[in-house]
Amino acid sequence: MSKFWFDMTEDIIPNHMISVDVKDMPEFFQQEKFDGNSMMCRKLEMLPIECIVRGYITGSGWESYKKTGKVCGIELPEGLKESDKLPEPIYTPSTKAEIGDHDENISFEQSVTHLEKYFPGRGQELAEKLRDNTIALYKKCAEYALSKGIIIADTKFEFGLDEEGNMVIGDEMLTPDSSRFWPAEGYEPGHGQPSFDKQFARDWLKANPDNDWTLPQDIVDKTIGKYLQGYEMLTGKKL
């Protein structure tokens, strides 16, 4: 799925993908188990910001809005309902936490300061590019997804710098692991929405707090099914 989106958005920003064909990869990866599951990429210096964009109000954003009328410090119109589409997508960056810790939501101004620590003299420039690329990518991909019957409620991008210092999108892109995908059919604000992403598994875990964090096989199978359905709707291909 990342390859699909990388190919679609090359006009906005370059990506780190070199090839998904195992024949192009080192000999060790030229095995059946890696075919279709691997991507060879350029090495990047990753930027220490999680670039989150929200087109609809849901999840932690909804919880924050109910309490404060804001999401990550951004004031939103009064009277929004859960799952409402926002007037414009909002950019809500966070820091990248160490493994085991939680990412911290920060303002745009704080992202400038944070980046300046790692890239002296480039904090403002990099923060603006992260924000602008994030919004541009979301708008293009959300419009396409909607034409295929899927709402991208929110997502996360990660960017890095190549050897020349140019910004490149890396990691994965617009998969069900980093995005909320809702079916457009039956979309109705005022409550949570069914989804084609990991929220299904999360909801089961929340409903079963005494579980030992082992998902039953039927929940695993249903989650896989939702991932596949989202992929097939978006790409028109079957796996």
Please identify what each model-predicted range represents.
Residues 67, 77-125, 169, 173-234:
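Anionic ligand-binding catalytic core segments
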Residues 39, 43, 131, 155:
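Short, charged/polar micro-motifs that form catalytic or ligand-binding hotspots
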Residues 1-98, 211-239:
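Active-site loop/lid in soluble adenylation, ligation, and acyl-transfer enzymes
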Residues 62-63, 164, 178-180:
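Intrinsically disordered, low-complexity acidic/polar segments
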Residues 53, 152-173:
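Conserved metal-phosphate-binding beta-hairpin within the catalytic cores
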Residues 119-153:
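A long amphipathic alpha-helix within ATP-dependent nucleotide-binding catalytic cores
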